[in-house]
């Protein structure tokens, strides 16, 4: 696990984009993408770039259950607004949060991941150490699955909604075992509220109580943090 400290989120996005360009030069074809505030500066760099992404495939980590793709809080909408509308890909995959059978949708998504191995996976990290929507207690062996969101996650995500009551209580998420199959992982974290999770991820025991701790076992993880998020690493 390599730690890169940056001045701010803007610099973090630039570093992540440089890593992506290196990966593309080596033949990467499938990107694993995340939502939330952490990767936005990275997506801004992608949008500003003259690079053409139309031969790439993207696979997103997760989607809320019960939200239409037209909802401005859906992750499908987020990705279109922040990246896909400006930079078309060959194919974009996200879980279908309105699937009639969400368990079957999870299995369908696993098949997509199997057919498109992820070369470059972007991650954020939750205050409780979650990656994707894999909450504390999630089995490291889990693949794509339906998640009951913890109160801390609902509270953290409520800033994007009119009220906390509007935040969905479930999501479909790529599992930890799925994430660990990625050839390269770039995790972005900014702000003091992420410091405890980053410390546990880097130095703590590998435990399902802190899902991101499993990344210690991955061969190629780069963590990009500002000084606030890295404040407990010294």
Curated annotation (Swiss-Prot):
GO terms for cellular component: cytoplasm. Pathway: Amino-sugar metabolism; N-acetylneuraminate degradation; D-fructose 6-phosphate from N-acetylneuraminate: step 5/5. Its EC number is 3.5.99.6. GO terms for biological process: carbohydrate metabolic process; glucosamine catabolic process; N-acetylglucosamine catabolic process; N-acetylneuraminate catabolic process. The active site is at 62 (proton acceptor), 128 (for ring-opening step), 130 (proton acceptor), 135 (for ring-opening step). It catalyses: alpha-D-glucosamine 6-phosphate + H2O = beta-D-fructose 6-phosphate + NH4(+). It is an enzyme of class 3 (hydrolase). Coiled coil: none annotated. InterPro entries: Glc/Gal-6P_isomerase (IPR006148), Glucosamine6P_isomerase (IPR004547), Glucosamine6P_isomerase_CS (IPR018321), NagB/RpiA_transferase-like (IPR037171). Keywords: Carbohydrate metabolism, Hydrolase. GO terms for molecular function: glucosamine-6-phosphate deaminase activity; identical protein binding. It holds the Pfam family Glucosamine_iso. CDD domains: GlcN6P_deaminase (cd01399). Catalyzes the reversible isomerization-deamination of glucosamine 6-phosphate (GlcN6P) to form fructose 6-phosphate (Fru6P) and ammonium ion. Belongs to the glucosamine/galactosamine-6-phosphate isomerase family. NagB subfamily. This is Glucosamine-6-phosphate deaminase. It comes from Streptococcus pyogenes serotype M18 (strain MGAS8232). The gene is nagB.
């Amino acid at each position: 696990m390599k730690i890169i400290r940056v001045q701010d989120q803007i610099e973090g996005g630039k570093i992540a984009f440089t890593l992506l360009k290196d990966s593309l030069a080596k033949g990467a074809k499938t990107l694993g993408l995340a939502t939330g505030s952490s990767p936005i500066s990275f997506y801004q760099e992608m949008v500003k770039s003259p690079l053409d992404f139309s031969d790439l495939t993207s696979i997103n980590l997760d989607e809320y259950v019960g939200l239409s793709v037209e909802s401005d809080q859906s992750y499908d909408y987020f990705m279109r607004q922040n990246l896909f509308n400006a930079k078309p890909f060959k194919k974009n995959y996200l879980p279908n949060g309105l699937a009639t059978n969400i368990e079957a949708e999870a299995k369908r998504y696993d098949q997509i991941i199997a057919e498109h191995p992820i070369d470059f996976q972007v991650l954020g990290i939750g205050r409780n150490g979650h990656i994707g929507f894999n909450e504390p207690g999630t089995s490291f062996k889990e693949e794509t699955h339906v998640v009951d969101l913890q109160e801390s996650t609902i509270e953290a995500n409520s800033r994007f909604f009119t009220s906390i009551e509007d935040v969905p209580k479930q999501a479909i998420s790529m599992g930890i075992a799925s994430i660990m199959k990625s050839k390269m992982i770039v995790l972005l974290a900014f702000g003091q509220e992420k410091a405890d999770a980053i410390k546990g991820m880097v130095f703590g025991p590998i435990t399902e109580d802190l899902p991101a701790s499993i990344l210690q076992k991955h061969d190629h993880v780069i963590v990009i943090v500002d000084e606030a998020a890295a404040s407990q690493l010294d």
